[in-house]
Design a protein with these regions (language model features):
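A conserved mid-protein helix/loop that constitutes part of the nucleotide-sugar donor-binding site
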Residues: 2-18
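Nucleotide-activated donor-binding/catalytic signature segment of Leloir-type glycosyltransferases, i.e.
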Residues: 40-68, 72
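Conserved donor-binding/catalytic loop of nucleotide-activated donor transferases
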Residues: 75-77, 95-107, 117-119
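Aromatic "clamp/platform" in nucleotide-sugar-dependent glycosyltransferases that forms part
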Residues: 85
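Short glycine/serine-rich donor-binding loops of glycosyltransferases
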Residues: 90-93, 111
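C-terminal amphipathic helix plus adjacent low-complexity
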Residues: 139-145, 149-220
């Protein structure tokens, strides 16, 4: 429920999509998060304000659960959504694909690598409509990839139009993608290979050469 996760935005947009498609009795948004996260929004307040608690249109999962129960949760939903405006990788969507459940994601960060292998798609992509540059004293600048809600509505419609079998086929392709490209055998091999290459090219601490070309000047 951090600000960049856009949890409040997702709830507002989900409510609008329910209104547009008359699906208040047929669709449910399940969020596994902390609704009182000090770095996020008060999700209880948003849900109550939008009256999304009347038919339990939005459910919150707030306690830690076992991997088996988490896998069951992914298995019982139609898709997993991530509309974060910045995402390093996105563990939840990787978990979703590994359980055979397709995803709807913002095309930012590592999410771009998860949703497609360059040939097949394992969900519905959302392309940023604008980019903002934000920052702080510690982080001078970072990009925010912002979405248009109409594109979100369209993605939801497309996902539902696939039907149960279409979503299953897409999700199983995504699972194959995860098993092939994110397994621990490959991870261990690539990790060791990268460290050896770094040592070979950059040297050890006493013989390091990555700072060549950098000039240090005294500032009065």
């Amino acid at each position: 429920n951090a600000r960049r996760k856009q949890s409040g935005t997702l709830i507002f947009w989900f409510k609008e999509w329910l209104d547009l498609t008359d699906n208040h009795d047929n669709a449910q948004l399940l969020m596994h998060t902390d609704p009182k996260d000090p770095h996020g929004q008060d999700l209880h307040k948003i849900i109550n304000t939008l009256r999304l608690d009347t038919n339990r249109q939005v459910l919150l999962s707030t306690t830690k659960i076992t991997p088996q129960h988490l896998a069951a949760m992914y298995g019982m939903v139609d898709c997993t959504i991530n509309i974060s405006d910045a995402e390093g990788f996105g563990l939840a969507t990787l978990e979703s694909l590994s359980c055979g459940t397709p995803i709807i994601v913002n095309m930012t960060g590592g999410l771009q690598e998860q949703i497609t292998d360059g040939l097949d798609w394992f969900g519905i992509p959302l392309y940023p409509s604008s980019k903002a540059i934000i920052g702080s004293q510690d982080v001078p600048y970072i990009y925010e990839d912002r979405l248009d809600k109409k594109q979100f509505f369209s993605a939801m419609d497309k996902m539902m139009a696939l039907g149960k079998e279409g979503r299953k086929e897409m999700g199983l392709k995504g699972r194959d993608h995860v098993m092939k490209n994110y397994n621990f055998t490959n991870f261990n091999a690539v990790w060791i290979e990268n460290l050896l290459n770094l040592h070979e090219k950059g040297g050890s601490w006493d013989t390091r050469n990555y700072n060549q070309g950098i000039r240090f000047k005294e500032v009065a």
